[in-house]
């Protein structure tokens, strides 16, 4: 077993060696390096064929038509393109958008930008387990609502939203439904031929593909229209201009092909490892599970350890690569906005750790992590006067601290 142990697969994944090997064949003069938009010679044709194969691989994993897959630079761009693109195209019908407070920043900040442009956004508060109350969602839908954007799996707590039912609700009212599926693709079955989803964002690097590549699914029947956000040569059927990065697309396609083959066995293995990790931690005093295991993704475990500072715990766990909050916002010391939206107090939100497991995680690593966390929590609490007061029966929430 090599240290440090990587348990931050929700932040990014290493490229699968099969993916890296395949990508190498699309870079140099000896490989297929052409521009897929070059229609006048075989270098271009071969590159175009490689892109087509990758597009098919992605479509097969998610049950769509390959022509519905638009390549982007990542899920952040896909979220931006979906939300801004749909809002701009359908704004004559209305200017009201619905999303949730626990969405990824790529969705929330895109919605904030649209608010500055005159759109109205309703940010729903989820239930304490992270799930959206479907009755509450129905209650905020209006005649001028044009778009609902709800993620499939939350990147911090792993909760799985009922996108099937939400899709039916949106469909019945003629509202466009966008889903950020960055964390779910390859871990949960997605069948866009059955789901009433109009737009869906995907990433390459959360599923053992390369960084810098993603895709947006745009439904063809009934046709969904979006306004381009990147202008140029009209690539990707006019929705996203820019020369296609063949090596990255091939890498993403190969990653999705492998995921389709191995998903059923891998998901079971991950769920067993996640449950093993939780079973090893759950009898620590004052430990709280954020989210809900039975409604959660198989690879994410978010736990709060009361009376322990999250930052000091992460430092104590230097042999474990884990995160507090998401990587996108971990440069700030603010407690996780996702956990705050679930109603956790600052102390519990600050003491949360997200463990996310993946393809290369072993049972031995999970057992090592359990042992290390238990020892570290014990040691840090011994140093904590708050823990001592708690053990003496003092209710810390009632203490009035004097300002100085």
Curated annotation (Swiss-Prot):
It catalyses: (sulfur carrier)-H + L-cysteine = (sulfur carrier)-SH + L-alanine. Keywords: 2Fe-2S, Cytoplasm, Iron, Iron-sulfur, Metal-binding, Pyridoxal phosphate, Transferase. Its EC number is 2.8.1.7. Its main location: cytoplasm. The modification N6-(pyridoxal phosphate)lysine is found at residue 206. It comes from the Bacteria. PROSITE patterns: AA_TRANSFER_CLASS_5. GO terms for molecular function: 2 iron, 2 sulfur cluster binding; cysteine desulfurase activity; metal ion binding; pyridoxal phosphate binding. GO terms for biological process: [2Fe-2S] cluster assembly. It is found in: Cytoplasm. This is Cysteine desulfurase IscS. GO terms for cellular component: L-cysteine desulfurase complex. Its cofactor is pyridoxal 5'-phosphate. Pyridoxal 5'-phosphate binds at residues 75-76, 155, 183, 203-205, 243. The keyword Transferase applies. Master enzyme that delivers sulfur to a number of partners involved in Fe-S cluster assembly, tRNA modification or cofactor biosynthesis. Catalyzes the removal of elemental sulfur atoms from cysteine to produce alanine. Functions as a sulfur delivery protein for Fe-S cluster synthesis onto IscU, an Fe-S scaffold assembly protein, as well as other S acceptor proteins. Gene3D superfamilies: Aspartate Aminotransferase, domain 1, Type I PLP-dependent aspartate aminotransferase-like (Major domain). It comes from Edwardsiella ictaluri (strain 93-146).
């Amino acid at each position: 077993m090599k240290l440090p142990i990587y348990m931050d697969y929700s932040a990014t994944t290493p490229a699968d060696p099969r993916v890296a090997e395949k990508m190498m064949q699309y870079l140099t003069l000896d490989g297929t390096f052409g521009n897929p938009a070059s229609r006048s010679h075989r270098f271009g044709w071969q590159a175009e064929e490689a892109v087509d194969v990758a597009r098919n691989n992605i479509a097969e994993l998610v049950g769509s038509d390959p022509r519905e897959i638009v390549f982007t630079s990542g899920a952040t761009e896909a979220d931006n393109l979906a939300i801004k693109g749909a809002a701009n195209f359908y704004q004559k019908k209305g200017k009201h958008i619905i999303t949730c407070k626990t969405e990824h920043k790529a969705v929330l900040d895109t919605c904030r930008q649209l608010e500055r442009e005159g759109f109205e956004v309703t940010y729903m508060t989820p239930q304490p387990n992270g799930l959206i109350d479907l009755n509450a969602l129905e209650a905020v839908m209006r005649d001028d609502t044009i778009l609902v954007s709800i993620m499939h799996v939350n990147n911090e707590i792993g909760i799985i939203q009922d996108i099937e039912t939400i899709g039916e609700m949106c469909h019945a009212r003629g509202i466009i439904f966008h889903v950020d599926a960055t964390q779910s693709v390859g871990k949960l079955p997605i069948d866009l031929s059955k789901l009433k989803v109009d737009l869906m964002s995907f990433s390459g690097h959360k599923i053992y593909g390369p960084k810098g590549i993603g895709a947006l699914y745009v439904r063809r029947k009934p046709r969904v229209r979006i306004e381009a956000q990147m202008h140029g040569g009209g690539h990707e059927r006019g929705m996203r201009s820019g020369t296609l990065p063949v090596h990255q697309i091939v890498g993403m396609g190969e990653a999705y092909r492998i995921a389709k083959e191995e998903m059923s066995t891998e998901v079971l293995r991950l769920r067993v490892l996640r449950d093993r990790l939780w079973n090893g931690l759950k009898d620590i005093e004052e430990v709280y599970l954020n989210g809900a295991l039975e409604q959660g993704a198989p690879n994410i475990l978010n736990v709060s350890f009361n009376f322990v500072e999250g930052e000091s715990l992460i430092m104590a766990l230097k042999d474990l690569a884990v995160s507090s909050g998401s990587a996108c916002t971990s440069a700030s010391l603010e407690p996780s906005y996702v956990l705050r939206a679930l109603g956790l107090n600052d102390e519990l939100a600050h003491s949360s750790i997200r463990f996310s497991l993946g393809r290369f995680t072993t049972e031995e690593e999970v057992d090592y992590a359990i042992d290390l966390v238990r020892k570290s929590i014990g040691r840090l609490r011994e140093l904590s006067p708050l823990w001592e007061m708690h053990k003496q029966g003092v209710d810390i929430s009632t203490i009035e601290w004097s300002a100085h």
